[in-house]
């Protein structure tokens, strides 16, 4: 069985994947292993087959901000493969896992050979630009309290069996949330205490429950309207 067929990005295409797969490398990684670092000159694309990684960017002053996590089925490194510029992010493993490492020439060859894959890449890049634009807007106009609300909503999913509630699993560490929204851990801790006292969030075993997500949504919407 052709292993590239395990990668969602290449499913249901008319490509003969075997020849491309011969030019890729498959390797396992360990927890806390750095897969890609800032300013690396490599241009390979990494397709996550198993495991989870975290993506960080760094300001000129050295401050690091978490862009997010990636899991099996997702990939990173496409920008360097496209423009050949040094890596702009650090990608570190959160768990053990496996990646398919595809050289940039192979990636570009596939993109130009398959209209289906080409469109998938365009849609993915458009989605990422929209997400970054939304986060830029939040960092520009919202205070840390409302940035925290927005991030919690973004990280959450519907809580099964509890209508109207949302849940973040596993519960996020305060220092991780701080790195996501650009503030200090102590500030996140204070806001969590306030949200808990208001009955808006609840910490359970293995999860953070957002009891009334509509309240957080309304607060964010009102804060954004005030900036217009």
Language-model-derived ranges and their functions:
Residues 199:
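Glycine-centered, phosphate/nucleic-acid-interacting loop/turn motifs that mediate DNA/RNA or nucleotide
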Residues 112-185:
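Polybasic "coupling" helices that flank or enter modular domains
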Residues 159, 173, 208-226:
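Short, cationic-aromatic polyanion-contact patches
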Residues 8-9, 33-96:
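Cyclic nucleotide-binding regulatory domains
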